[in-house]
Curated annotation (Swiss-Prot):
Pfam families associated with the record: Toxin_GhoT_OrtT (PF10753)
Subcellular compartments: Cell inner membrane
UniProt protein name: Toxin GhoT
Organism the protein comes from: Escherichia coli (strain K12)
UniProt induction comment: Expression controlled by its antitoxin GhoS, which digests ghoT transcripts in a sequence-specific manner. Post-transcriptionally regulated by MqsR which acts on the ghoST transcript selectively, degrading the ghoS segment while leaving ghoT intact; conditions which induce MqsR (e.g. overexpression, nalidixic acid, azolocillin or H(2)O(2)) decrease ghoS expression and thus increase ghoT transcripts.
Record gene name: ghoT
Function comment: Toxic component of a type V toxin-antitoxin (TA) system. Causes membrane damage when induced by MqsR, slowing cell growth and increasing the formation of dormant persister cells; involved with GhoS, its antitoxin, in reducing cell growth during antibacterial stress. Overexpression causes cell lysis, forming ghost cells; both effects are neutralized by expression of GhoS. Overexpression in the presence of ampicillin increases persister cell formation (persister cells exhibit antibiotic tolerance without genetic change).
Spans through the membrane: 7-27, 37-57
Main location: membrane
Length: 57
């Protein structure tokens, strides 16, 4: 398995985990929850830690 494939699998797993986390953290309407979970999911290396910090306050 090439390095690119391993990185891609790691990224997809991170997308799925962050999508689920943000889906349960947000308390908006369903379509807004879906949009926010999707956007945080695809940019999870930078935005997931920020979203988790904001959810603490």
């Amino acid at each position: 398995m090439a390095l690119f494939s391993k990185i891609l699998i790691f990224y997809v797993i991170g997308v799925n985990i962050s999508f689920v986390i943000i889906w349960f953290i947000s308390h908006e309407k369903t379509h807004i929850r879906l949009l926010s979970a999707f956007l945080v999911g695809i940019t999870w290396p930078m935005s997931l830690p920020v979203a988790l910090l904001f959810s603490l306050f």
